Design a protein with these regions (language model features):
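Flexible "arm" and connector segments at domain edges
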Residues: 4-86, 90-150
Length: 150
């Protein structure tokens, strides 16, 4: 039987009767991706909420991990593997943002709202020849300035 052992302010911690971290994905239904990468970082003893410095050792590590995951996405051989690699890429992306104290959940909400403003003057999407949705005249860039640490 699973018991709830403790609750931290940066996500949910579920443990089994022996005190092992739960590996059942259903244990994390109430957690956001940010909650989960913060939990991972805490348990794996990898510090978060650092000041961002471009080309610092931690920045280079996070970029290498993103590149590794992207390469694995490109090399995926079937649908299930592709989905797994896309999830890994998203997870590492959330971990990268959390490393520097950035709330990627909120950034994605704002980028989504911005993307929804890409309609043309007639209220319909405008497409490039390859199918990419272009920015219409009503496009509003997201304001993320309050989400980044100075």
């Amino acid at each position: 039987m699973t018991q709830f052992k403790s609750l931290f302010n940066i996500g949910f911690e579920f443990f089994d009767a022996e005190g092992s971290a739960m590996t059942d994905p259903n244990s994390y239904l109430a957690a956001t991706p940010l909650d989960m990468v913060r939990q991972f970082s805490r348990i794996m003893d990898t510090p978060l909420d650092r000041e961002y410095r471009q080309n610092s050792a931690i920045d280079r590590l996070r970029l290498r991990l993103l590149q590794e995951e992207f390469d694995e996405v490109c090399a995926a051989e079937d649908d299930e593997n592709l989905l797994k690699e896309l999830a890994d890429l998203a997870y590492v992306t959330f971990l990268y943002a959390a490393t520097f104290g950035w709330d990627l959940d909120e950034a994605i909400r704002r980028v989504h709202a911005s993307n929804m403003s890409k309609l043309g003057p007639d209220g319909k999407p405008v497409y490039r020849d390859d199918g990419k949705v272009l920015k219409g005249k009503n496009y509003q860039a997201p304001d993320l300035s309050d989400l980044v640490c100075d």
